[in-house]
Design a protein with these regions (language model features):
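Active-site C-terminal subdomain of aminotransferase-like
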Residues: 20-21, 197-288
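Conserved beta-loop-alpha segment that forms the PLP phosphate-binding cup at the N-terminus of a helix
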Residues: 61-89, 93, 97-101
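A glycine-/small-polar-enriched, mobile loop at the entrance of the PLP active site in fold-type I
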Residues: 10-67, 71
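Conserved PLP-binding catalytic core of the aspartate aminotransferase-like
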Residues: 296-329
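Active-site phosphate-binding strand-loop segment of PLP-dependent enzymes
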Residues: 122-178, 191, 199
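Conserved active-site segment immediately N-terminal to the catalytic lysine
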Residues: 185-197
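PLP-dependent enzyme catalytic core of the Aspartate aminotransferase-like
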Residues: 340, 344-372
Length: 372
């Protein structure tokens, strides 16, 4: 086998993530690497924390990007707050709620499942009923934007119910942050994580997280050691915390953090509300075009994500053949269904930098050709 310099094809990324990356972000990532404890880099870290607080709409001091993809953010929140023997209410309406359950059980806790059909939002009343029936539950976990189905749940209400029953609440905002409203402080979310590769329009590899004081108090007063050295918040905050003197914890992905900083600047320049409006408007245009092609959406309108549209594959249409046609003939990537939805839906993402009118037009043209 011969290896040579890799030159990737130019793709239009219209799947569930990653999204296309803004040229300014790519340019930022190509700048010279400096040390992860360099005073200039420490200054950049502070700016990233400031910009993430803006994006999460929070004043939480402990707000920073974990080194790793969104799944590492998920594990960071769970392994710090879950202890062996605990009961945790896990809301599942797709693949990623199921992943939360798996992590909870790996931590030696018992997952109490609050389930909804794939493609539906979590019913807050079902969570209420579960928490009423078992006062030993101390933590809830739920997905804001379920990437496997394109459905969004009302996490403000889920958090309110959680606190009513003296539970801390963990929220997954991997696909929602930057694309639809996420208001950490106003909604009283205790621990939240996201991902860099969705509406923040960065390459994969960083997972922004934020923890409020209630969550930090629970972590500091654990009966057992956090079951991960790398993700132990008691350790990592010596590097990402507020101290003027930073301690070595791990070597941060320096150039990736350059990119995240630039992406967050771009989002602030656009304005969060404008970003939310752009994603909503472009979603409406895409769905209008899909209907004209005779295609139907999978999620009902009031629960549908604007940044990720799931489309029912018509009877007799070969899922893989259509996706391959789009990729090979038009350089467009759309996503397949996962789990029980494999072969039944396509996932079309207008996410972050990929959410624009030109991409909508190109996607609809390509689908029209593929379905002839």
């Amino acid at each position: 086998m011969e290896a040579k310099t890799f030159n990737p094809p130019k793709r239009i990324l219209l799947g569930p993530g990653p999204s296309n990356v803004h040229p300014r972000v790519l340019e930022a990532m190509a700048r010279p690497t400096i040390g992860h404890l360099d005073p200039a880099f420490v200054g950049l870290m502070e700016e990233i924390k400031f910009l993430l607080r803006y994006t999460f709409k929070t004043e939480n001091e402990i707000t920073f990007p974990v080194s790793g993809p969104g799944s590492v953010g998920m594990e960071t929140c769970l392994v710090n707050l879950v202890e062996p023997g605990m009961k945790v209410a896990v809301c599942i309406n797709g693949v990623f709620g199921g992943r939360m359950k798996d992590i909870v059980e790996r931590c030696g806790a018992k997952a109490i499942v609050v389930e909804a059909g794939w493609g539906s939002a979590i019913d807050p009343q079902r969570l209420e009923d579960v928490l009423k029936s078992d006062p030993d539950i101390k933590l809830t976990a739920f997905i804001h934007a379920e990437t496997s189905t394109g459905a969004q749940s009302n996490i403000k209400e889920l958090a309110e119910i959680s606190h009513k029953h003296n539970c801390l609440a963990i929220a997954d905002t991997v696909t929602s942050l930057g694309g639809i409203p996420v208001k950490v402080d106003e909604w009283n979310l205790d621990a939240v994580y996201s991902g860099s590769q969705k509406c923040l329009s960065c390459p994969p590899g960083l997972s922004p997280v934020t923890f409020n004081e209630k969550a930090l108090h629970a972590i500091k007063n654990r009966k057992t050691k956090v079951q991960s050295w790398f993700m132990d918040l008691n350790l990592i905050t010596s590097y990402w915390g507020s101290s003027s003197r930073r301690s070595y914890h791990h070597t941060a992905p320096i150039n990736a953090l350059y990119g995240l900083h630039e992406a967050l600047l771009l989002l602030k320049e656009e304005g969060l509300e404008n970003s939310w409006k752009r994603h909503k408007l472009n979603s409406e245009k895409l769905i209008t075009g899909l209907k004209q092609l005779g295609l139907n959406t999978f999620v009902k309108e009031e629960e549908r994500l604007p940044e990720l549209t799931t489309v029912k594959i018509p009877d007799g249409v070969d899922d893989l053949k259509v996706r391959n046609f789009l990729l090979e003939k038009h350089n467009i990537e759309i996503g397949a269904g996962l789990g029980s939805l494999a072969g039944k839906i396509w996932r079309i993402g207008l996410i972050g930098y990929s959410s624009n009118e030109e991409n909508i037009s190109n996607c609809l043209t390509a689908l029209k050709e593929a379905l002839k």
